[in-house]
Amino acid sequence: MRGIYTPVTDIRRKVFTEVARMAYEVNELSDYEQLMRELPFKIIPGEEKSLRSSIFLERAIISERVRLAMGMSLRPLDESVPASEGLEHSVIADKYYEPPLINVIKFACNACPEKVIKVTAMCQGCLAHPCQEVCPKHAISFRNGKSHIDQSLCVKCGRCVNSCPYSAIVKTERPCAAACGMGAIHSDEHGRAEIDYDKCVSCVMCLVNCPFGAIVDKGQIFQLIQSIKRGDEVVAIVAPAFINQFPGMTPSKLKEAMRQLGFADVAEVAIGADLCTIDEAKDFMEEVPAKIPFMGTSCCPAWSVMAKKLFPQQAECISMAMTPMVLTARLIKKEKPNARICFIGPCAAKKLEASRRSVRSEVDFVLTFEELMGLFEAKAVNFADLPDNPEDAFNSASADARGFAASGGVAQAVVNAIKKMDPDREVKVMSAQGLADCKKMMMMAKAGKYNGYLLEGMACPGGCIAGAGTLADPAKSVAMLNKYKNEAAMKVATETPYQDSLDLLHY
């Protein structure tokens, strides 16, 4: 639903904005506690319900959303626990993360049916009965001339759906489960959505696709602002998918906008994408097929975790190259050892990547574009009034690096780099977007169908530009991204001025 400002989007925006405003304007623990009690009434004012069965239910959900936005955990449903319980652990100027990242607010869940095939009133009672003829379980009979499905026999194969000439039979599925390429969502004993964290890779497609806003990820807005207020030198590193996310925001306006939030400096993660491209190009040339039959890209954490989790025997075939986020963070910390790095991008899975032991010291905070918009609104940053200073434009990365934001862009960048390094080398490529298709690609690779290939996996359909933390219509963003790529002075990763620093970043 990105690009559509729904009531769910509005609620999320208001929560992020109010949490950011509270963090900027308040200092005392007691004041935070008071505001946490008051925010549900500020966000849902008045006496009448607006979206749900009760205004009290709406406010209870907001209270949990506020906690999660501050990095805190959901409260137990069977105990009386204050909204501010555990606040003292959250009021810190450092990364605060207590698993799980992705949470279902149970009383916000609609308990949608998992999967149902049913006959609608559009059934014409035709003579051919194709629905009955194709059913392998004899689950379809006719009552008063109309098709009827015996749900106890139906196996949800969908053949009747495809055969009906009137499209009178429909297949409905719980949206969050349908969006999950890992099959990680099932029902609890009350029919509400429940996440199997052994399967979940935090792509957060379930969150994007839940029409009731019951699925929420934890945030680091609160801790980031504490760090800024403490006077830390916080440097924002921004993923190239930022293009078109903020109305009226040009690349050259972004730096000033971030300064108004308190950031000391801003860099583009595309710098690290160039270095990642070079790493993966070299690895591919050295290892495929001499050591491994194929190589998968590394930059999407949800894809790489999925591949290693479901295909452990092929785990060595997934590139060990550091991601653009980590490479950019390390490059900045080489120049500014005391800097604190905040990655800002389209991806919630980056929050987990940044919590890994190998990455924790490099990346201090992670925000999505949606969360960043909350900061802009809290500080009343007017994009139209920002100076469009050409000196503030990003100009240190290649067009190929900016292309990482769209599906197919990572593989194309690596191929172009290999052509520069070894013009005679032929590289076969296969790309997949969405974890379900990524899984199919890996199954084919496991069967030997992609030997010699470079495989690009993107957990989000469309790539990062359509990530769970984006705001804009992905189709429009892709068009703007292509324009942004064409404006780059450098075209291929091998032209990066930071190539000599690459060896220093491997430690």
Question: Which residue stretches match the model-derived regions?
Answer:
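C-terminal edge-of-domain segments
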Residues: 78-80, 104
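Gly-rich Lys/Arg/Thr-decorated short loops/hinges at beta-loop-alpha junctions or inter-strand turns
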Residues: 110-118, 141-146, 187, 205-207, ...
